[in-house]
Amino acid sequence: MSKIGPEVGDVRTSRRTFSGNGVTVESYTAMPVVPVVDGGAQMPLQSPALILIHEWWGVTPHIEDIARRYAGEGFIVIAPDLYDGVTTTDAGEAGRLMSELSLEKGLAYLQVVLAELRTWPNVAAIGVTGFCMGGTFALRLACAAKLDAAVPFYGDIPEDTGFIAGLSCPLLFIGGEKDAWITTDKMGRLAAALEQYSQPGEVKIYAGASHAFFNDTRPEVYSPADAADAWQTVIDFMKRKLLPEGA
């Protein structure tokens, strides 16, 4: 089921519902506009797709903006709502929502979206990215399902990193040196696990950057120069990993 939204530049947005295995997931989608119609929405042929996972605030206008930016770069983007329609600007409420979302439930939602994307004949390859809580889920999904690329932004890394042995794709982890939550020690733990399990991954740490430095709606932590560099780095990485050779 889909509800088609307006075109913004060369991007079409919609809100779509995906179901499977007893799970129903509402999602915000954005994709390049081309004259090919499939399932009620316009989609490009043989394009890379991204699952974009939100921060602990929910699917906010900031996440929708990121989805449109990716679509403007040629990606089909699905931003699944792990909070079933709830958003907040209150950190206490966000913390409660995040704590009530189990890893198992979040991954079940994401697996439904991934299964849906795999049925779209126009999808060439699938990557995942996410921020904060979404970065945690992006990392976990890349270790629990077959994907083609993963870029978690400042997601959590637990002490037990054994799950990294299941990493299915090239990984680019992005963090900030001054992040008080996802510390350099945690990121070092991830780098060590990637080496231990001989997994294809890189940890990129921005000097002086804080947690959520990419979020331009939060001036207290936003770092414009680092965000711009991270954006171009991620676009280049995703295109290298998700586009066919010579595309």
Model-derived features: where do they sit?
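Primarily recognizes the serine-hydrolase "nucleophile elbow" in alpha/beta-hydrolase
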Residues: 111-168
